[in-house]
Amino acid sequence: MKLEFDHVGMVVKSIKKTMDNLSALFGVELPKSGFFSQIFEYEEGRFVMLPVNGVKIELLQPKAGPLLDFLKERGDGALCEICFRVDNIEKQYDKFKKMGITPLDDFDGTPLIDRKYTPTHGAKFFYLPRKGKGAAFEILELPDELT
């Protein structure tokens, strides 16, 4: 079973301001085309995946929900997730269940029931329960066109 680092996620007050800062400090910019050139809207906010020299940084700008609570508690730019990509999320799910770990459907701690992953842009993912107030581990399976 393949397991690779995929990205880190940061909660931010403003994707635009954070992008401006990253551009000024490090010359980081969104690609001109493709999946990684887009800012995506979702029910509780928006996000962008920013490729930086082979590493991806996900900027999450919440407007509601558990990530907004995390932002208020931890502050702008706080690391909220460390994501690992797997080639078979079903096997990874089974492995964690056998270990007595219940995968979560969302950052808020909602248990994932009967493998009903919430697909986002073809990706399947779940979280592992957080210990304390730190970042969550996210487990992700991507469709071939996004790898």
Q: What residues fall within each predicted segment?
A:
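Internal, well-ordered alpha/beta segment that forms a basic, Gly-enriched binding/recognition surface
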Residues: A123
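Core segments of cupin and vicinal oxygen chelate
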Residues: K2, M10-K56, Q92-T120, L128
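Long, charged/polar, surface-exposed segments that mediate recognition or autoinhibition
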Residues: L71-G100
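N-terminal beta-strand motif that seeds the catalytic metal site of vicinal oxygen chelate
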Residues: M1-D20, L79-F84, L140-T147
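Histidine- and/or cysteine-centered catalytic micro-motif in compact active-site loops
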Residues: I15, P62-A64, D87
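Amphipathic N-proximal alpha-helical interface segments
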Residues: L59-P66, F137-L140
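A short, polar/proline- and glycine-enriched secondary-structure boundary/capping micro-motif
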Residues: L25, L68-K72, L104, T147
